Amino acid sequence: MSPTTPKKSAAKKTGKTPAMAAAPKVLLDLLNACGPSGYETAPAAVWRDAAKGFAKVSTDVVGTPLALVAPKHDARSPARRLLVMGHIDEIGLIVTHIDDQGYLWFGSVGGWDAQILVGQRVVLDTRAGKVTGVVGKKPIHLLREDERKKVAEIRDLHIDIGARDGDDARERVRIGDVAVIDAGPVELPNGRLLSRALDNRLGSFVALEAARLVAEAGGAEWELAAVAVAQEEITFGGSRTSAFALEPDAAIVVDVTHATDAPGIDVKEIGKHELGSGPVISRGSTLHPQLFELLYETAEREMIPFTVEASARSTGTDADAVHISRAGVPTGLVSIPIRYMHSPVELVQLEDVYACARLIAAAALRLDGDATFSR
């Protein structure tokens, strides 16, 4: 669907999106942190520290940080609980073998297009600190004709850390150490940001920012539990355990989706979601219709531009795990359009990020203490 056309007006209680948004320090710190699935300690610490100023903070054994924003003083007791989550892990690489020449062989953590990896500089997270390497393969000059036609596979690639031999490499790197591509955030013109790990440090930032906006407004009728869930790219582990432990009365998941204003993307398949068109509200079989309507109506009331994305089956996000937790959780999904997903050069319009946080905060503030999502 086409985005709604907003009038020039600040949203009540939930802040105002800057005309030409800049990247906040906490988002840049999140993007600079190394945190593939299962190894999210560094970005989780950034997120947790940022939440301490306005929420009660903790971390579970899976590695998911939680920020609880208390309901306003005159809210019904006990208050209902809204869970807002965005996963904080990223795709990465994991060392599976170190050969006697000192080359590191690796597997993928999450879904990679192997062609993207060739020639990339990487940073390995080891017990001794950061180790720099490069993903290598046989040079094109030495490839046979049949090899030149073959698409690169991860099993054909290795990481070179400049080791003299296997012993030298093993002194610095262990089996099971992880790596990410060395591609930190770069602010581009027109309020755009380029980085690896926008999928989904953006979602974790939005959950954090929405919680901050609700706290700044004095709380909502519902308690708000914001989480930056671990392990989405591999198992949905963080969302499964968080939804089970927190027993929310409703949930809103924040992730990224494909921006369709890049070459080669068919809007007939996934809809029209351009950079700058605002958050993308999902509607589909696994998502609760009343939460969709709440988000849709809130966006219209707050004059926030948005688009709608249809999801016929599963969404490929944490929403798939949350909505079937325990006896079921009414779940909504809001996404941020980005270009070049699962690459080191993901690209976003920062205004969309701020607008997404504003939308979720405004929806949380609209929830009545007696609201139910029965069908």
Would you name each region that the model predicts?
Residues M1-R375:
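N-terminal hydrophobic/helix-forming segments and targeting peptides
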